[in-house]
């Protein structure tokens, strides 16, 4: 194994990728620092669950179509497949012999831990294992949940987003803007929620569109960023995710 394994940086809640928000750089001068290590900046759903973000991250690293998992997609009520990164992977030969360093900020922390869990269970049938990740580094990582989620409308007892909450209103405002701009905003800031069907249908009025979005299961279940960041969500994830002796954790 090379001692110059690639580094992949994963943004947090409401974060953005290198092709969004013009000159703004989520990682500051990180890519200007001289280093022999190849570095890549991922772009995953800023409002998506740790699981969905991990699936999007895996596809970007490997260069494959996003696969959220057949059982997961059926249970949560969204499409199984997402964007196709075939031929565009950061590390096409990603494997145990060519592992990566993962760096996650905020929600990026549970995202990269979830990714290693899925790799350890060969979730995508690539013949993967936990050793595809040589190190996991978290920066202000939300590893045990955050009480801030309850201020945004998560129920303190269940962790689920309340029907009338700031989070729900924010989502509707975002989607109304997306409708009004005809999707142009995706080139500026992409919420990556296409697998939930948040795409304007031909001939659909704004009222019909918002009604459909409001009825989506996205904020009614556990497959969203808000739940992933609650104490309940973190507790459930930490009960399943493991650490592995061949991986460095910081």
Question: PLM features: residue spans?
Answer:
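Helical cap/lid subdomain of alpha/beta-hydrolase-fold lipid enzymes
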Residues: 117, 126-250
